[in-house]
Amino acid sequence: QLTAPTPCSEMDVRAMLGHLVGVLDRIAALGRGDDPFAVTETPAPDDRWSDAWTTSARRVAEAWRDDAVLEQPMALPWIHGSGADVLASYLSELTVHTWDLATATGQQPDWDDTVVAEALAARDFLPAENRRALFEEISTAMGLDEVAVPFAEATPVPDDAPAIDRLVAWNGR
């Protein structure tokens, strides 16, 4: 299934797995006070994705183990806030891409309501309207001209749709 397409049109399953490990590495970099945009995504061998994920997750836990990091001000093109706010925005990305992988591989996870609620709350840092232009403006102001816009335009979904559906719709799925 590694070559199967995902709803994130520029990535197949293999590329998505590499991206998710890279996201964890960026989260760890932020926790250490390093530049998350200096992190490069390095694909793992096809039979080592689980090991790569576990190693990167341990780096995240180590980098964020001091609660003071949660209070530190941090800035990314899509959010300026505390470390906790930035973590929530990455939780949103990880949740959406987990949905992408589940969809691509025919799985239907039992979504954790608390996790999805936190991921949904994180989307409030950027408006659904005109956010691409805002993202590009902020990226340029931060000197990050090479950072790709991490979401597509929001798609309509009923207000009473399941939380995971509202989250992925906000991200253009």
Q: What are the language-model segments listed below?
A:
Residues R14-R32:
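Alpha-helical bundle segments that constitute or directly flank the non-heme di-iron/ferroxidase center
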Residues Q1-S9, A29-A61, R65-R173:
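Structured surface interface patches that mediate subunit assembly and partner/cofactor docking
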